[in-house]
Every structure is written in C-alpha cells, then in structure tokens.
Design a protein with these regions (language model features):
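Juxtamembrane regions of bacterial inner-membrane/periplasmic proteins
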Residues: 2-182
Length: 183
C-alpha cells in the first residue's frame, strides 16, 4: 500500500506541475513573442539528420505590421468561422468524422486556434494523445489570449514552405517585400 500511495502522490504532483507549467507558458506567450516553436526545432533536426543545409527563416512581426488582407485570406481559406467559435468548429469535426467512418480520405477539421496551439506547444502528428493535448491548449489560448493574439501568433508561427515560418519570412522569401505591404 505504501508504494501505491507514493505512486499516486507522485502522479498527482506530476499532473499538477504539468498543469501549472502549461498555464504559465500560455500566460507568458500572451505577452512575449513566440520566436521559436517545437516544429521549427523538429524541422532543423530533420534537415541535419538528412544532411541538408539548415534553413530557418523567421521574423516575428506584430499583427499591426502584417497586411490585413493576409489575415482575411487566412481566415477565408483556413477557418471562416474563426471569429464565431470558441476554438472548435463542431460542424467540420462532425463532417470529418463522418467521412472517416465512410472510409473516405481523412481530412483536417482543425481551426486556426487548434493549429496555433499545435504549432506553439506541441509536435506534428496524428495521435489521439496529441489531439487531446491540443484541445486542452486550444481552450487555454481561447480563454487567455483571445482572437487577436491567436491570429498574431498563428501568422508568425505557421510553416509556409521549407524552413520558412510566419508572414514576414514568406513575404520576404517569395515577394521580396515586408508583410505589411502584401495585398
């Protein structure tokens, strides 16, 4: 019984530590730019592993320095209900589930909020564990950050090509101009 009690206390303490540290990280990123994400480190590792040159282009820009049409285009193409939901588009989730049950190709139903949670706090992958943790972080960022901050972090952390992350890096790499000049 002593060992079981120690295991239970240790498990409780670990869960409490994970909960508190996740809250602290989300609160910190409400105010601090997200300069690097787990995905960036994973991609650099893959480049090294595959003996490719390391490419990591990323420059944080405040939302007001990113062209409004870019944000509008992202919402239109990725999550047209972004301003109307609390992080989850239940209709798209149900459609994706129905398609999967019919044996159709699995399609994404992740919102901008879910993608931001994944990009900033997690790793790429398609496991139920990662999706569960993603849902937890999605609730936290919706609650603590709000839509404007979620959009700002999304536009600065999204992978937009091989080694290119965020609106400013893609604007420079593909259009040779700053993100605020995109139309």
């Amino acid at each position: 019984m002593r060992i079981l009690k120690k295991i239970l206390i240790g498990s409780r303490n670990l869960l409490l530590l994970l909960f508190v540290s996740s809250l602290l990280a989300v609160v910190a990123y409400k105010f601090i730019p997200v300069y690097y994400t787990p995905l960036m480190f994973i991609r650099v590792y893959e480049q090294v592993r595959d003996s490719k040159p390391i490419k990591l282009e990323h420059k944080w820009m405040p939302l007001k320095q990113i062209a409004q049409p870019l944000a509008q285009a992202v919402v239109a193409s990725e999550d047209n209900l972004f301003l109307d939901h609390d992080g989850f588009d239940m209709i798209q989730i149900q459609k994706a589930r129905a398609d999967a049950e019919k044996g159709k190709r699995v399609r994404g139903a992740s919102t901008i909020s879910q993608q931001t949670a994944k990009n900033v706090f997690l790793w790429p992958g398609r496991t139920y564990l990662r999706k569960g943790i993603e849902a937890y972080f999605t609730v936290l960022i919706e609650w603590i950050w709000g839509k404007e901050r979620i959009m700002e972090v999304y536009l600065n952390s999204i992978e937009m090509g091989d080694g290119i992350y965020g609106a400013e890096a893609v604007a420079q790499a593909h259009f040779k101009k700053p993100a605020y000049k995109l139309t």
